[in-house]
Every structure is written in C-alpha cells, then in structure tokens.
C-alpha cells in the first residue's frame, strides 16, 4: 500500500483512507480476515504506512505501533536521509539488518509518536534515522520528522506486515540515488526488499 495524501489528508494523514475500511462492515471483515491469514504479507509505504497504522487494531501483532503526527519542523520534508535497518522479524528486511542506506523521504506527517516509553520499547522497529556517526537520532535535519528514537519503520510480531514512512521504492536502482560508488545501472541494496517479498510468495 503506497499512495500519497489520500483524501487530501483532510482528516489526518491516512485516516480517511483507513476509515473507508473501518466503517464499512463488509470491507472491515474482509481486511481482518486477510491479515489473520498466515499466508499473506503487506508493505505500507508513506501514506500506506499512515493508513495501516490507523488500522492497527485489525492487524495481529501491531498493538504497539505508534501514531504518525505532523513533522516536528511543521514542514513537508522531501530529500534523501540516512537510515539503519535494525534486527526485526520483518520478512521484507531479511538479510539487511545492520545496513545503513540513503532513502527518499517525502512527507508532512511522518513523526512516529508512541503512547508511552513502554510502547516504544515493545514495538518491533524495522528502521530508524541515524546521523553521520551512525547513531539513532531525533535531531533535525538527520531525522526529518522528529520521530521518537529515530524510529520510522515497524513490523508485526510475525513480520508479515511492515510499515515505513521512507520510500525505498524510489531508490531501488543506483540511478535514483544522488551519488553512488556502484554502477548506476545496477540495483541498489533496497532491491533486496523485493527479492525477499518474491521469496515469500514461494
């Protein structure tokens, strides 16, 4: 699930989109059944991340996910930022843990806000913003939105549903990066997300 500014973000980022599922009994039941099936997986990026965060009550293992609020800068932030992929159950990031990679960010409401420190500690983080020393940070501009502990990607306890505010799909080839040591015609490390998804299909 991707997209951008669904319903104009009038009700809050992703809320209108999520509400179109939550308040339609037929669609809500269908979605609940989908997430309950063990042979499905889902990736939510940016507006898809915000939408799925609103649907967390329907997603097994997502009870510790945060809300996504307006950026601390009160501005739309669009540029490359540096993230670290942290150990998690996510099927999408298998084999990528420990990588520090540039990634495109393009959002106005990407600040992950947890209800409590305990909720943040219990959440299964997937990626976080880091500074030029590789340390998780809440400091601007390394962290473009001010997310708690730099967290900007999460997954469920079983790793089948993953959400993230950054856009790895906008940087899966080196040609999409601002600079690279690699051949610009080659896939970047972000391509591993899609290889992992393909393997999950079988």
Q: Could you describe each region identified by the protein language model?
A:
Residues 1-2:
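A structural preference for short, pocket-lining loop segments at secondary-structure junctions
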């Amino acid at each position: 699930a991707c997209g951008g500014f669904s319903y104009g973000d009038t009700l809050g980022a992703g809320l209108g989109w999520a509400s179109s599922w939550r308040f339609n009994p037929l669609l809500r039941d269908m979605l609940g059944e989908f997430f309950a099936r063990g042979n499905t997986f889902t990736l939510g990026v940016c507006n898809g991340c915000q939408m799925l965060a609103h649907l967390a009550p329907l997603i097994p293992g997502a009870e510790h996910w945060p809300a996504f609020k307006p950026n601390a800068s009160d501005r739309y932030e669009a540029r490359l930022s540096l993230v670290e992929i942290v150990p998690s159950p996510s099927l999408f990031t298998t084999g990528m843990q420990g990588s520090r990679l540039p990634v495109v960010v393009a959002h106005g409401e990407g600040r992950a806000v947890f209800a409590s420190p305990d909720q943040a500690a219990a959440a299964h983080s997937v990626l976080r913003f880091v500074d030029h020393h590789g340390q998780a940070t809440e400091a601007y501009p390394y962290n473009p939105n001010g997310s708690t502990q730099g967290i900007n990607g999460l997954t469920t306890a079983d790793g089948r549903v993953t959400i993230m505010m950054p856009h790895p799909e906008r940087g899966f080839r080196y040609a999409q990066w601002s600079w690279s040591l690699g051949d610009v015609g080659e896939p970047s490390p972000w391509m591993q997300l899609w290889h992992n998804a393909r393997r999950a299909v079988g």
